């Protein structure tokens, strides 16, 4: 990857006025600096000017001379926790940072966006830097425009950061009794590949084409945008190529004489997911034959179809009369030269990329009319046939400048500017947006952790990972679901040192309020941080699978990190077993001291066992410390 020099990167920090010191946004009033670390104060000033930096915990100032481009840097050791301090930077014109604390600084990153309004909150020793969500094609040197700097924790700030982050910071402060700084760096509904740097993606199989493209284009935004435009155009052309209703650039299924007797029927308006096409994304053609009254002959018609998700092409007797996209109502005009009395065929080609698809809205939205006459309702039964399923083609290319899913886009904008700012550790709360490519998740997560540690030059930088909790309503074993596999991939990070997994499968929506869930996750994160970052080694952990032994028609499961014993409970839920046919059945489970024995009458010869292998997890196995067991499986089917 092309390396940008330090001074060239500094040019991107902000507009610079002569003789005025400019620094990255995380150097501000109310900031918290990591105690007993070395902070790299840096920025720009006038060229060849002596820079003086005074800190409240040291009598003698630090000095350096800016280079020809005005770039300067000073490495300043920080003391143990304390404050408030003032920090003054001057090149002849002073800039003073007020109310600076020294304590513990943590980065909270990912896609968690559970925001709660918590009135009455105020804690001057907990400070928050909420990073403005943004994306970038190349690594940035300063935080996104709109990032306002550090703030005291207040009721207003709780609506700007995830509730789990808030409870983590507050409980950490109360536990350690030192100032805490939280850098909140979240972007909802984003996948892990967007948080990986270019260098990290180079280490992950399957991203060779992406990284080679960026490298060959020199990371130049205009060239990357042009390449994306070509890819997107080619992708949409492929939709027509593979659409069975579109042959040799001709809309075969829109022709009025096309024989549609074997097509199924669907009531419109209405989402097709509830009418025979569940979980379908792709192209569906709709046809309806109507009678045009004699009085309408050779008159211009108004065609109202209501809202359509997501895109549509509309034909009247085989002739295209309009196209639409987005959520708006579809209003089209049928030219008078196409209108003849008698039979006419209206055809709608609908393309849906995600979510509900079809002709939506209300029955009164669908009508054909001529000025001064009673409209003809088009609601009711339509013939339909799918022309293309998107499950059979590559995903649509991701916009590099507009889509936060673009690989490396969030790392470039949100994480890279923070590199070098000392952190005690990182909380990673992300995952649900990777259900479509869960098989890549473990590699992406491991590469990201190693890369961030390398860039911070902290091979022991603690990573606390929040495992995805319950999702949806179904509590049955989920053989085809991606969510259990995501949890398994998240747990793979435990093979790296100084990592911790915070299990949340017991915190379902049915069992706790959002506020209580956030509080519990925050508490568990603090416990994990005490062990990984602060040397408290004797704290309880989440029980996890160690091994198992088949004993006749039963399986005996051995665990680690149980503590004294499991908490007694009847009935014990969440286990399933399978034989060589690989069909899993719910299992009866009993606790035997620090082990669990499972069996099922449907499986006389069990070979595999799973625990909490479902979207919404029913398991109730806890240690006596109140920590839930980690979901697992013994098979690799």
Task: Describe every region a protein language model picked out.
Residues 82-92, 345-348, 606-614:
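Short, aromatic- and glycine-rich surface loops/edge beta-strands on solvent-exposed regions
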Residues 556, 562-637:
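C-terminal beta-sandwich/jelly-roll accessory domains of carbohydrate-active enzymes
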Residues 263, 290, 296-318, 346-348:
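Aromatic-lined ligand-binding clefts that engage carbohydrates, nucleic acids, or primary amines
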Residues 25-29, 280-293, 330-332, 412:
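Short beta-strands within extracellular/lumenal beta-sheet-rich domains
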Residues 20, 26-104, 356, 587:
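Ser/Thr-rich low-complexity repeats and stalk/linker segments
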Residues 58-82, 314-365:
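Beta-strand-rich ligand-recognition modules
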Residues 34-41, 278-281, 302, 520, ...:
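Surface beta-strand/loop "capping" patches
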Residues 95-152, 185-272, 343-412, 418-421:
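An acidic-aromatic loop/edge-strand motif
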């Amino acid at each position: 990857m092309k390396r940008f020099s330090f001074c060239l990167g500094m040019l991107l920090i902000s507009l610079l006025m002569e003789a005025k010191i400019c620094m990255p946004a995380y150097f501000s009033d109310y900031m918290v600096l990591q105690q007993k670390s070395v902070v790299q104060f840096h920025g720009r000033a006038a060229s060849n000017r002596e820079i003086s930096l005074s800190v409240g915990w040291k009598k003698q100032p630090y000095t350096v001379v800016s280079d020809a481009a005005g770039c300067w840097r000073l490495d300043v050791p920080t003391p143990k926790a304390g404050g408030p301090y003032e920090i003054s930077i001057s090149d002849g014109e002073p800039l003073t940072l007020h109310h600076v604390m020294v304590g513990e600084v943590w980065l909270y990153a990912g896609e968690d966006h559970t925001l709660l309004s918590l009135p009455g909150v105020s804690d001057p020793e907990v400070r928050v830097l909420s990073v403005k969500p943004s994306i970038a094609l190349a690594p940035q040197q300063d935080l996104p425009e709109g990032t306002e700097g550090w703030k005291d924790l207040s009721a207003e700030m709780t609506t700007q950061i995830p509730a789990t982050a808030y409870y983590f910071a507050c409980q950490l402060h109360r536990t350690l009794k030192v100032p805490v700084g939280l850098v909140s760096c979240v972007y909802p509904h984003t996948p892990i590949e967007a948080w990986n740097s270019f260098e990290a993606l180079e280490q992950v199989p399957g991203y060779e084409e992406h990284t080679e493209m960026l490298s060959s284009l020199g990371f130049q935004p205009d060239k990357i945008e042009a390449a994306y435009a070509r890819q997107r155009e080619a992708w949409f052309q492929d939709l027509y190529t593979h659409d069975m209703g579109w042959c040799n650039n001709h809309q075969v299924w829109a022709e009025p004489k096309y024989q549609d007797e074997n097509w199924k029927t669907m009531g419109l308006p209405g989402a097709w997911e509830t009418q025979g096409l569940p979980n379908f994304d792709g192209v569906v053609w709709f046809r309806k034959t109507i009678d045009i009254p004699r009085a309408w002959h050779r008159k211009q018609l108004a065609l109202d179809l209501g809202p359509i998700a997501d895109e549509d092409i509309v034909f009247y007797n085989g002739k295209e009369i309009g196209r639409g996209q987005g959520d708006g109502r579809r209003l089209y005009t049928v030219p008078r030269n196409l209108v003849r009395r008698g039979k006419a065929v209206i055809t709608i080609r609908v393309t849906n990329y995600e979510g509900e698809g079809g002709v939506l809205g209300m029955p009164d939205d669908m009508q054909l009319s001529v000025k001064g006459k009673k409209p003809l309702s088009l609601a009711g039964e339509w013939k339909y046939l799918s022309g293309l399923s998107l499950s059979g083609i590559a995903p649509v290319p991701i916009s590099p400048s507009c889509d936060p899913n673009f690989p490396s886009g969030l790392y470039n904008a949100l994480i890279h500017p923070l590199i070098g700012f000392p952190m005690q550790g990182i909380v990673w709360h992300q995952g649900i947006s990777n259900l479509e490519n869960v098989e890549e998740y473990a590699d992406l997560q491991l590469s990201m952790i190693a890369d961030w540690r390398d860039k911070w030059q902290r091979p022991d930088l603690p990573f606390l990972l929040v495992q995805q909790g319950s999702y949806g309503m179904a509590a049955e074993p989920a053989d085809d679901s991606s969510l259990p596999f995501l949890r398994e991939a998240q747990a793979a990070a435990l093979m790296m040192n100084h990592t911790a997994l915070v299990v949340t499968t017991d915190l379902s929506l049915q069992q706790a309020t959002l506020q209580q869930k956030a509080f519990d996750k925050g508490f568990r994160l603090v416990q994990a941080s005490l062990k990984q970052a602060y040397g408290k080694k004797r704290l309880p952990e989440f029980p996890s699978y160690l091994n198992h032994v088949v004993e006749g028609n039963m399986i005996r499961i051995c665990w680690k990190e149980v503590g004294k014993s499991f908490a007694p409970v009847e009935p014990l839920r969440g286990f399933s077993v399978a034989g060589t046919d690989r069909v899993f059945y719910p299992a009866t489970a009993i606790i035997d001291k620090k082990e669990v024995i499972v069996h099922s009458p449907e499986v006389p010869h069990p070979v595999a066992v799973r625990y909490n292998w479902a979207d919404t997890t029913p398991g109730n196995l806890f240690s006596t410390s109140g920590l839930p067991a980690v979901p697992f499986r013994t098979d690799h089917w």
